[in-house]
């Protein structure tokens, strides 16, 4: 029995070492095939690109609160967020994702939507590379300009015009929260296609902003009372 146990331990150690070596080889191979970040630089010079300084803080605050509340402290992959999302999705709470804003930038610029281990590996490696090359505000800026938000709108400036007929600097807190709820499911959650779900998402985001100290109780109450006025 003792010999069998010893043999099992040896096989287990060999399996772990072998798995680690295979993982290292896969990572090295994937690293060599990663694209350059030139596409990000080029996109920042497109005519309709909106710099972060011209995006309302209420809007960036709402987006970070719902999409990636640890955005400014993680290195592209939020391991705490992965665990929290798993717990939330097993409970009765609104479902949460584990993709960070950086991972979404990597996916939106470079990758397909295929749910494969290879694509996920590229997404993780690209996220680390993006984090090393750009500041957090630059990454958030790219996200705010690129993300699809339903009704043919790409980026929050386009979405503000599409849904409310406004410029970004004209948005109210309630409208910012409404738009921030779109990235998760832009076709299903937008106020044109499904006002009830859009409202539910808006309220949840305002609650998160209040809990995180991004807005005051008065701002929260005022935003809840504001009627929805689409263009």
UniProtKB/Swiss-Prot annotation:
It comes from the Bacteria. Gene3D superfamilies: Biosynthetic peptidoglycan transglycosylase-like (1.10.3810.10). InterPro entries: Glyco_trans_51 (IPR001264), Glycosyltr_51/Transpeptidase (IPR050396), Lysozyme-like_dom_sf (IPR023346), PBP_transglycosylase (IPR036950). GO terms for biological process: cell wall organization; peptidoglycan biosynthetic process; regulation of cell shape. Pfam families: Transgly. Pathway: Cell wall biogenesis; peptidoglycan biosynthesis. The keyword Transmembrane applies. The chain crosses the membrane at residues 8-28. The keyword Transmembrane applies. GO terms for cellular component: extracellular region; membrane; outer membrane-bounded periplasmic space. One of its GO terms (molecular function) is peptidoglycan glycosyltransferase activity. Its EC number is 2.4.2.-. Its main location: secreted. It is found in: Secreted; Membrane. Keywords: Cell shape, Cell wall biogenesis/degradation, Membrane, Peptidoglycan synthesis, Secreted, Transferase, Transmembrane, Transmembrane helix. It is an enzyme of class 2 (transferase). Cell wall formation. Belongs to the glycosyltransferase 51 family. PANTHER family: BINDING PROTEIN TRANSPEPTIDASE, PUTATIVE-RELATED, PENICILLIN-BINDING PROTEIN 1A. This is Putative transglycosylase H16_A0665. It comes from Cupriavidus necator (strain ATCC 17699 / DSM 428 / KCTC 22496 / NCIMB 10442 / H16 / Stanier 337) (Ralstonia eutropha).
């Amino acid at each position: 029995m003792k010999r069998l146990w010893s043999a099992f331990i040896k096989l287990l150690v060999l399996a772990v070492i072998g798995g680690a070596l295979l993982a290292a080889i896969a990572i090295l191979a994937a690293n060599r095939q990663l694209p350059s970040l030139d596409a990000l630089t080029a996109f920042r010079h497109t005519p309709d690109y909106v710099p972060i300084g011209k995006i309302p803080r209420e809007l960036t605050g709402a987006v970070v609160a719902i999409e990636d509340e640890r955005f400014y402290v993680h290195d592209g992959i939020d391991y705490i967020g992965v665990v929290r999302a798993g717990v939330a999705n097993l409970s009765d709470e609104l479902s949460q994702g584990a993709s960070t804003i950086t991972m979404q930038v990597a996916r939106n610029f470079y990758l397909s939507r295929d749910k494969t281990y290879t694509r996920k590996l590229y997404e993780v490696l690209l996220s680390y590379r993006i984090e090393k090359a750009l500041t957090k505000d630059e990454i958030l800026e790219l996200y705010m300009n690129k993300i699809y938000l339903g009704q043919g709108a790409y980026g929050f400036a386009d979405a503000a015009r599409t849904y409310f007929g406004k410029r970004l600097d004209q948005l109210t807190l309630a409208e910012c929260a409404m738009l921030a709820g779109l990235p998760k499911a832009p076709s299903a959650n937008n106020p044109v296609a499904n006002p009830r779900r859009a409202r539910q998402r808006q309220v949840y985001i305002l609650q998160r902003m209040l809990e995180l100290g991004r807005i005051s109780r008065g701002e929260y109450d005022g935003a809840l009372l504001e009627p929805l006025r689409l263009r």
